[in-house]
């Protein structure tokens, strides 16, 4: 397959005529292609490039950016949510119609996802069409126009998107949990506050992109593409904004409680304490503890009846319930605890029994076989999460932004094996002794407050 490249200025790029053909070299005739090793490059401007040529018929490229909701402030809340919906708006190089029609014409897909830490712009298509979608990806992320009338027309979608997401009580409780646990940064919701819907302006969108979509805050990850070509694209078109951008405030854990009385017969509740930042040895210990307690059913639509949390609660509660450990790690903090779903009348018994089970482990009642079984579950879950191209792309991109490097699965498994039984017990102790945060919704007449635990 012939590699075609064309140089051009930034102004010419906006005409969508100069991006290099992002195509991989074919294997020699008659020789079955073998996937190559992951190639990793960090440019002087801080931009990270990683690629894996797996010779798959479809390619996937993701641009990961440190621009999640934690980087919003009190004056621009909801900006990242609107950006998430604005990927098809007119840019300096293509109209909204051209972007939508161009992607559709080759059977491709452009998606935007975001967490509290990062935003990810991902394109998927047949490998022969990567150059087409790559140009749209670059336009959307480096040359948005945010025309006033297009932004205004998109505002009602914020309310719909939020309403659909928060139909799930678990999503609502998790959002409230972060708001209760933190005073800033990680307290910011993934969804635009109601009072800001209709008020996010094109100027705010431009400022957010200008301050956060910088080279040092980006990672370009490709699967099914050639590393030299991906590197050339990054050097030529993602070097527009230099510098580190706005660093953002460090998350301040404080603890607190948000209760939402709505009369639902099922009570959803989450109780957590601060844990550890992602990538640390302590975070690995909390991950093992999560699987010691029970991270959820391993059979589709199955029960969680074999977990220690479930068994502990079942001894004293005879109404239907569900309970699992909760674990979330971020770049500078983390949350660990458990999540319960129960009948309103038994909510207090379920929460207290689950809390007492963690206290039991904190007192040293933990066997080595239980720890080994938890490690095996954690390792299996991790390996299965990176088995798909989507999961692998997300893992490489997240690591590239967090650490500027990539830790292969073999090393991750060694880090999990290095967790000692005492480390897991200490993690449980940290939860028990730590300042708690709680969020609950439903008929809360029998749901205890934090100080009642």
Swiss-Prot record:
Domain of life the protein comes from: Eukaryota
Membrane topology: Peripheral membrane protein
Modified residues (N6-acetyllysine): 66, 199, 250
SUPFAM superfamilies linked: LuxS/MPP-like metallohydrolase
Transit peptide, residues from-to: 1-14
InterPro entries in UniProt: Metalloenz_LuxS/M16, MPP/UQCRC_Complex, Pept_M16_N, Pept_M16_Zn_BS, Peptidase_M16_C
Function: Component of the ubiquinol-cytochrome c oxidoreductase, a multisubunit transmembrane complex that is part of the mitochondrial electron transport chain which drives oxidative phosphorylation.
Name of the protein described by the UniProt record: Cytochrome b-c1 complex subunit 2, mitochondrial
Name of the gene encoding the protein in the UniProt record: UQCRC2
């Amino acid at each position: 397959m012939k590699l075609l490249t064309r140089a051009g200025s930034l102004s010419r790029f906006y005409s969508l005529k100069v991006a290099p053909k992002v195509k991989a070299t074919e294997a020699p005739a008659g020789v079955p292609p073998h996937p190559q090793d992951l190639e990793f490059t960090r440019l002087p401007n801080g931009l990270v490039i990683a690629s894996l040529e797996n010779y798959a018929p479809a390619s996937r490229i993701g641009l990961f950016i440190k621009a999640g909701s934690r980087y919003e402030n009190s004056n621009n809340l909801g900006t990242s949510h609107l950006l998430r919906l604005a990927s098809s708006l007119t840019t300096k190089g293509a109209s909204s119609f051209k972007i939508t029609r161009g992607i559709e014409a080759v059977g491709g897909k452009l998606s935007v996802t975001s967490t509290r830490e990062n935003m990810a712009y991902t394109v998927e298509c047949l490998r022969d069409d990567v150059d087409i979608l790559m140009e749209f990806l670059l336009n959307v992320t480096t040359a948005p126009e945010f025309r006033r009338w297009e932004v205004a027309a998109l505002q009602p979608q914020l309310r719909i998107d939020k309403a659909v997401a928060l139909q799930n009580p678990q999503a609502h409780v998790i959002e409230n949990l972060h708001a209760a646990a933190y005073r800033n940064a990680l307290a910011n919701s993934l969804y635009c506050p109601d009072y800001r819907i209709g008020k996010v302006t094109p100027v705010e969108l431009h400022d957010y992109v200008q301050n956060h979509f910088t080279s040092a805050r980006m990672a370009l990850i490709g699967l099914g593409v050639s590393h030299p070509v991906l590197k050339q694209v990054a050097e030529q078109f993602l070097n527009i904004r230099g510098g580190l951008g706005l660093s953002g405030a460090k998350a301040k854990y404080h603890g607190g409680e948000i209760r939402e009385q709505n009369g639902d017969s099922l009570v959803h509740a989450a109780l957590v304490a601060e844990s550890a930042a992602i990538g640390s040895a302590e975070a690995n210990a909390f991950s093992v503890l999560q699987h010691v307690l029970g991270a959820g059913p391993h059979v589709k639509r199955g029960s969680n009846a074999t977990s220690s949390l479930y068994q502990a609660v079942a001894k004293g509660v005879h109404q239907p319930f569900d309970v699992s450990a909760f674990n979330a790690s971020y770049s500078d903090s983390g949350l660990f605890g458990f999540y319960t779903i129960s009948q309103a009348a038994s909510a207090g018994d379920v929460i207290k029994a689950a809390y007492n089970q963690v206290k039991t482990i904190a007192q040293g009642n933990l066997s080595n076989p239980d720890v080994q079984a938890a490690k095996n579950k954690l390792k299996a879950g991790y390996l299965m999460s990176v088995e798909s191209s989507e999961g692998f792309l997300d893992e490489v991109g997240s690591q590239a932004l967090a650490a500027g490097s990539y830790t292969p699965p073999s090393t991750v498994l060694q880090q999990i094996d290095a967790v000692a039984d005492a480390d897991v017990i200490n993690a449980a102790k940290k939860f028990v002794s730590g300042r708690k945060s709680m969020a609950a919704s439903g008929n809360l007449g029998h749901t205890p407050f934090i100080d009642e635990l």
